Structure formats: C-alpha cells, structure tokens
Design a protein with these regions (language model features):
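Cleavable N-terminal signal peptides
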Residues: 11-13, 23
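Generic cytosolic/nucleocytoplasmic N-terminal low-complexity/intrinsically disordered segments
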Residues: 1-2, 20
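Short hydrophobic alpha-helices and adjacent helix-cap/hinge residues
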Residues: 2-8, 25-147
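Sec/Tat signal peptide C-region and signal peptidase I cleavage site
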Residues: 19-25
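Terminal low-complexity, poorly structured segments
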Residues: 2, 13-14
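Residues in and immediately flanking transmembrane alpha helices
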Residues: 15-17, 103
Length: 147
C-alpha cells in the first residue's frame, strides 16, 4: 500500500510538472536521493523509476533520472542535492526523512517540486502543513503505521 501511494505521488508530481510547463517539454530531469542502502528503501527507488518509465512511454516524454545514495552522510547528501540543483532538475525525490528535509530546505522559494517517501511523521518534521493539504512544493507518503 505504501509503495503504491509513493508511485501515485510521483506520478501526480510528474504529471503536474508536465501540465504546468508553458511549452510541453520532451525531457524532464529527476533527481532521486536515497538515505541508505536498505532493501525497503531501494524498493521505493525502483518503483519510482519504473513508474516514471511507464509514465514517460504513456505521455511520450523522457525522464532523465539521476540517482544517488548518500549512505547517511550529511556532507554527501548536501553535495548530491547541490548537484541536483546545479543540473536544474525538474523534480527531486527524497527517500527518508533527512533527505526530504534537506531537499525541502534547498528548494524553498523555488518551483522545484519535492516528493518524499519513507517519512514517518511528515507533519511533525515540518515537511508538510497537513496530510490532506501539504502546501508549498513538497508532498509524498508516510511510512507511519497506526497500530
């Protein structure tokens, strides 16, 4: 269920990105940063990449995906996100809370959308205003289990 929600969020962000472009671009740059090498987090990355590929074929566009893993190193994460900004990516995807928070901070005041996943408390971490209306340029899925 969580994976499906992330894929839906990425698809919505990608579709919105395509629809809001003044001229329909054929190529979109997407930067994905994973926090650590972990089976469940890697699966999220794989699912996002697969869905972007499907969506690209469906819409006749290309998603040029740059993927990196910061291995829980804050300075490496900073460099990856700086590289995404220098490359002028159209969409950033942050996998895990620290990456999502840094992407949010890096894109504040810009039009670059951020999609996050594997974030337990998006509201408490300040990523979104609420789960129903995220606000700003950040949206995504939570891995919180309400047990």
């Amino acid at each position: 269920m969580k994976k499906r929600m992330l894929v839906i969020a990425a698809a919505v962000a990608a579709t919105t990105m395509m629809m809001t472009s003044p001229v329909m671009a054929e190529d979109f740059k997407v930067g994905i940063c994973n926090y650590v090498d972990d089976a469940s987090l890697n699966q999220i990355v794989d699912n996002v990449q697969s869905r972007l590929e499907e969506l690209g074929k469906e819409k006749g566009v290309t998603f040029d995906v740059s993927y990196d893993n910061c291995n829980a190193d804050a300075s490496v994460m900073e460099q990856i996100i700086s590289d995404f900004q220098a490359d002028k990516v159209d969409l950033m995807v942050g996998v895990a809370t620290p990456v999502a928070m840094r992407m949010q901070s890096a894109t504040e005041g810009s039009d670059t959308p951020v999609v996050f996943s594997a974030v337990s408390d998006p509201v408490g971490s300040g990523l979104v205003d609420s789960l129903d209306a995220p606000g700003a340029n950040v949206t995504g899925t939570s891995d919180h289990l309400d047990t």
